[in-house]
Amino acid sequence: MPVVTKLTSQKQKDFVNLYVDDEFYCGLSLNQVASWRLHKGSELTHDQLDRLRSEARVSKAYNLAIRYLGLRIHSSQEVIEYLRRKEFEDVSIVVVERLKREGYLQDENFALRWSAMRQQMLWSPRAIQDELSRKGISKDVIDDCIRGIDTREAIIELIAKKSRNQAIDREKMMRYLVGRGFSYSDIKPCLDDSGSK
């Protein structure tokens, strides 16, 4: 039966290296060491070692995800993609479900905050919808987020901002606003009201 021969500290203060039969086996959190009651001389079956390694992998992925969420709010899909890039694809779903249970991941809250931020930047509803869709947000949640956007006000503000120092070229302004995701039918009345040539 395999025997724990050494537990050494890592650079990360809450983690240790586990050595089994004088060979490095995996890194563990101090919580795992305590819950498994590991010490030098502990005997473990191969099945227990496999479970321990699997738990360690989930724990490491969870800690990475928590740090990632500390940078800014993210959607579930963004966290899954991040863990995939960090080579934790096999445990990404388990980690995301845990983060949701613990309240760290809420796609509805993310979508509301993200769309509000984009509205302040005068994004069109279509551009916000496309971005939230790419971030894995459901259509129902997206529809709730963009329902109250005042497209006309955003277009008028963009026209005013763009024409502050110069006369408005109607065609250029039209291309600019269409490029920002606004529809022709929303842009035309605003341009007519602005008196552009």
Spans of features found by a protein language model:
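An alpha-helical, amphipathic repeat domain used for nucleic-acid recognition
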Residues: 1-197
